[in-house]
Amino acid sequence: MAGPADRRASERMPVNRGTSCAYVGRVIDDIGAVKIRDVSLEGIGMVLMKSVPAGSMLVVGLSNADKGFIKTVIVEVAHVTPITGAFLVGGTFLEPLTYQELTTLVM
């Protein structure tokens, strides 16, 4: 049990020998304005003002304020297509959305 000086909102649990961390990365760029064009369980199409390289990883915050939905996902960029004044970027979620998450996001 945590002591009185510990102000964490929830208790942290100790780990066992089998627990590990596969990776840690820094979010170093702010891509700027983004518009979601379409989304599926497995991926997303976005319009970005800056180009990003295919194969790069993006941290994407998805939200629907009306439904109180917020989720952060990692997207691997599959393709980048220049369009007038912007870039159409398609990517795959490293972990697919659930059907409930998808419908809450778009409906």
Enumerate the language-model features and the residues they cover.
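C-terminal output/interaction extensions
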Residues: 9, 21, 84-107
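Short, acidic/hydrophobic/Gly-rich beta-strand patch recurrent on exposed beta strands
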Residues: 35-37, 45-47, 89-94
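Short, surface-exposed secondary-structure edge patches
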Residues: 10, 47-51
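A residue-level detector for short acidic-glycine micro-motifs
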Residues: 38, 76-79, 95
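Beta-strand residues that line the small-molecule/cofactor-binding core
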Residues: 72
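N-terminal helix initiation/capping motif
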Residues: 1-39, 106-107
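Short, conserved beta-turn/loop elements at beta-strand boundaries and strand-helix junctions
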Residues: 41, 80-85
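Short conserved beta-strand and strand-loop elements enriched in small hydrophobics
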Residues: 18-25, 56-69
